[in-house]
Amino acid sequence: AWMHPLDANLVRTGRAERPHQVVPGLLNRMLFWVFVYGNPDTVPPAEIEYEIIDDQEIPVAGGLRAIHMPGHCAGQVAFLWSRHGGVVFAADAAANAMGLRLSITYEDVDTGKKSLRKLFNQNFEVAVFGHGTPIKHAAAQQFRDTFT
């Protein structure tokens, strides 16, 4: 497993998450109650073989560049794959459910918003998410338009 050091110890010790807050809005509160509330606070502990840091290249699929995106969680990482016009694997840094938007919860919403700006200077045509559908065209511009 590959993970940022700030979250690796959570997994090693069996903690599922740190305290987080729901992003404002009725829809986010409803989605939180349906999908997040009551989830276990613990997970089976696991070994993390590799700790990754910002701007590190991961030797997978011809090279993925890690982009540290704290906010959703302290160790949130997105990956940029330079092939096919650029593909961002945004994970939970943002969501694309009913449009490109913030995820439902963040450990620190303001930090999460600042982290999304890290993608403004990246070149990528496609973005995929932990939640929601992919953006298949002009994804970088959609990030700029949404999170400016």
Regions picked out by a protein language model, each given a short descriptive name:
Residues 1-50:
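Active-site HxH/HxHxD metal-binding segment of metal-dependent hydrolases
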Residues 39-47, 57, 63-147:
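Metallo-beta-lactamase
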